[in-house]
From Swiss-Prot:
Localization annotation: Plastid, Chloroplast stroma
PANTHER family cross-referenced by the UniProt entry: FATTY-ACID-BINDING PROTEIN 2 (PTHR47284:SF3)
UniProt cross-references to Pfam families, sorted A to Z: Chalcone_2
Descriptive protein name: Fatty-acid-binding protein 2
Keyword check for DNA-binding: no
Organism: Arabidopsis thaliana
Length: 398
C-alpha cells in the first residue's frame, strides 16, 4: 500500500493537481491506519456484546479441564469464530472488566489518532488546494502576461467603477484598467488583429511614453466580397486615441456617469468626433493587388457622402486636396502601413510607409474621416463598440 502510485489515486488533471496529495501525505497510508483503527474498535464492541455467552461456555469447563474438555473449549471458540478479531485470549478467566479495558484502550487509541490527524491545519489544506504558479494559466491573472491578443470578449461582464476609491477599476474589453495595473501594462507588446493576423503596437509612436503617444483601443479589418463567393481581406486597421486629449475634452463631462450607461452612448461617439480629440487610424494593407487609386476612390466616395450629410454647403476643396495625395506612383504592397492622424487644431495628416505625403486643415474632413469608424454606419460595428468601451475605461481613469 505504501508503494501505491499517487497517479492512480488522483487523476493527472484533477482539481488539486497533486498538490493536496503532496502536502498531506503521511507515510504509512492514512487510509489503511484509519481502517485498522475502525476495525479494532468494531472488534472490541462485538467482543463486549458477546462476552456473556462466551463466559457461560467457558465456566462449564473451567473446573478440572481434561484433554477432552480442552478440545471442547477449543471447539467453542472455533464455533464462535473468535479468531476473526485481532485479540488473543490467554487468560483463563475472561471477565467483563477484561473486555472493558480493551474497549477503553481502543477508543483512546482512536481518539489519539484523530487528534494527530487534526494537527494538519486548515491553512496547510488551503495552501495545498491553490495551484502552483507554474501551472496557473494566464487567464487566471488580473492582467494578461505575454498575451498578444487584447481584443474584447463579448461575454466579459462589465462592472461600474466604485466611487471614491484609491484605484478605481473598470472592466474594458479583456483588460482591467486601474491606476495600478495600467501603469504596469506592457506597452511594448503587439496586439494581433484576429482575422488577418496583422500586429499593431500598443503605442503608436515607437520609443515613446504613454503620456505623449496615442494608445491602441481597438483593431478590426475590412473585407470585400468578390462575385458573392470569395471574401477578400483588404486591410486591417488599428484605432488609437490620446488619453490626455480624451481626459481634457471629455473627462469632466462623463466622469460622474456610470460606465454601464456609457457603453453604447451615442453622445460619447459624437463628442469624440466633435471635440477635436487627437486620434489616429493605422491601416495595414493585406492584399497584394490593391492599387493606390482604388484606396483614393473608396475614401473619396465615403467622405463625400458624410460631408454632405453633415453639412450640404460644405466646401469640397478639402476633399480634393486629400485625394491629390494618393498619386499613381506610390506602391502599396501587402504590409504597407498608412497612417491618418487628426491633430487638436483640425488637421488630417496622412503618412504612407512612415513618409508624410500631405496634410489638410479641415475639421469637417477630420470628423467625416473618423466618422467612418465611430460614426453612423461604421466600417465595423463591433470595433466601434470596442472603441467606446476602451474610451470609457480611459475616462474613468482621468
Amino acid at each position: 500500500m505504501s508503494n501505491m502510485d499517487p497517479n492512480s489515486v488522483l487523476p493527472k488533471r484533477s482539481f488539486l493537481q497533486h498538490e493536496l496529495f503532496s502536502q498531506l501525505h503521511i507515510p504509512g497510508s492514512l487510509a489503511f491506519e484509519a481502517f485498522s483503527c475502525i476495525s479494532k474498535f468494531t472488534g472490541a464492541l462485538l467482543c463486549w456484546f458477546s462476552h456473556g455467552n462466551l463466559q457461560k461456555e467457558v465456566s462449564k469447563h473451567q473446573w478440572g479441564l481434561t484433554c477432552k474438555s480442552r478440545d471442547s473449549l477449543k471447539h467453542v471458540f472455533e464455533h464462535r469464530n473468535v479468531s476473526v478479531f485481532p485479540f488473543h485470549y490467554v487468560s483463563k478467566d475472561i471477565s467483563p472488566g477484561f473486555f472493558g479495558n480493551i474497549s477503553k484502550s481502543t477508543i483512546q487509541h482512536f481518539v489519539n489518532e484523530a487528534e494527530r490527524l487534526h494537527s494538519c491545519s486548515l491553512l496547510s489544506l488551503a495552501a495545498a488546494m491553490i495551484p502552483s504558479l507554474n501551472v496557473m494559466s494566464a487567464n487566471g491573472l488580473a492582467l494578461p502576461l505575454g498575451s498578444n491578443d487584447v481584443k474584447l470578449r463579448e461575454n466579459i461582464e462589465h462592472r461600474t467603477c466604485p466611487e471614491n476609491t484609491e484605484h478605481r477599476t473598470c472592466q474594458v474589453g479583456c483588460e482591467e484598467y486601474s491606476g495600478l495595473s495600467f501603469q504596469k501594462l506592457d506597452w511594448t507588446r503587439q496586439s494581433v488583429e484576429p482575422r488577418t493576423g496583422i500586429e499593431f503596437p500598443m503605442l503608436l509612436k515607437e520609443n515613446a511614453s504613454r503620456s505623449n503617444s496615442e494608445v491602441l483601443v481597438a483593431t478590426g479589418s475590412r473585407t470585400m466580397k468578390i462575385i458573392r463567393i470569395k471574401s477578400l481581406k483588404v486591410y486591417a486597421f488599428g484605432f488609437y486615441v490620446h488619453p490626455s486629449s480624451v481626459c481634457q475634452k471629455l473627462g469632466r463631462k462623463y466622469a460622474s456617469v456610470p460606465a454601464s450607461k456609457l457603453d453604447k452612448c451615442d453622445d460619447l461617439y459624437k463628442d469624440l468626433l466633435r471635440e477635436d480629440i487627437v486620434m489616429s487610424v493605422r491601416l495595414v494593407v493585406n492584399y497584394n493587388g490593391l492599387k493606390i487609386n482604388t484606396v483614393r476612390d473608396v475614401f473619396e466616395k465615403s467622405l463625400r457622402a458624410r460631408l454632405v450629410k453633415a453639412n450640404p454647403k460644405t466646401d469640397f476643396n478639402c476633399l480634393n486636396d486629400f485625394g491629390s495625395f494618393f498619386r499613381q506612383d506610390i506602391p502599396i504592397p501587402a504590409g504597407t502601413i498608412i497612417d491618418f492622424r487628426r491633430t487638436e487644431d483640425g488637421q488630417l495628416i496622412t503618412e504612407i510607409g512612415g513618409n508624410l505625403i500631405g496634410a489638410v486643415r479641415s475639421k469637417d474632413l477630420c470628423r467625416a474621416f473618423f466618422g467612418m469608424y465611430i460614426g453612423d454606419v461604421p466600417v465595423s460595428e463591433q470595433t466601434k463598440e470596442e472603441i467606446g468601451r476602451k474610451v470609457v475605461g480611459i475616462i474613468k481613469r482621468c
